[in-house]
């Protein structure tokens, strides 16, 4: 499991690096990325380009979040915290994918959702990794039932 967490940490860091290589936390940069910018000769993102990203991200992020949240179920936390962790991580992942489509094809205001969902997704993945690592490294007992 620790080896998986190391790979997940690499994915987490590279996800942030890829995001910040194209955009910033400024919604204007998100709009420029998705809608294009004539001043910098940037073309708008095509539907096919977005679809290809969605195709791979929906599978990869789904499996990643399924695995991380499954591991979190064994961490001694209340059922309420576990449920929130699962809902927030999957919600952030879906919102992060949908927000780009929203910016491109609905309204530039979805750029705020893209920034927020990216930050929430990165935060939830980091929290899941840290919770699982803490439980493993400090020999915390398994608590699948969430009785704590």
Where are these regions (language model features)?
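Membrane-interface interhelical connector segments
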Residues: 24-44
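Cytoplasmic juxtamembrane regions at transmembrane-helix boundaries
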Residues: 67-89
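Alpha-helical transmembrane segments of multi-pass integral membrane proteins
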Residues: 98-148
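N-terminal signal-anchor transmembrane alpha helix
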Residues: 1-25
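Hydrophobic alpha-helical membrane segments
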Residues: 84-101
């Amino acid at each position: 499991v620790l080896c998986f967490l190391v790979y997940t940490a690499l994915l987490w860091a590279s996800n942030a690096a890829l995001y910040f290589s194209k955009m910033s936390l400024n919604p204007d940069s998100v709009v420029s990325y998705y809608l294009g910018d004539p001043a910098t000769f940037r073309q708008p993102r095509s539907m096919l380009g977005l679809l290809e990203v969605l195709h791979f991200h929906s599978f990869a992020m789904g499996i990643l979040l399924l695995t991380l949240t499954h591991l979190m179920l064994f961490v001694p936390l209340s059922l309420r915290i576990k449920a929130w962790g699962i809902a927030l991580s999957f919600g952030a992942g879906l919102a992060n994918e949908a927000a780009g489509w929203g910016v491109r094809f609905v309204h530039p205001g979805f750029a705020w959702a893209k920034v927020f969902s990216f930050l929430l997704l990165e935060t939830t993945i980091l929290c899941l990794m840290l919770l699982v690592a803490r439980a493993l490294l400090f020999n915390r007992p398994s608590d699948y039932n969430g009785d704590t």
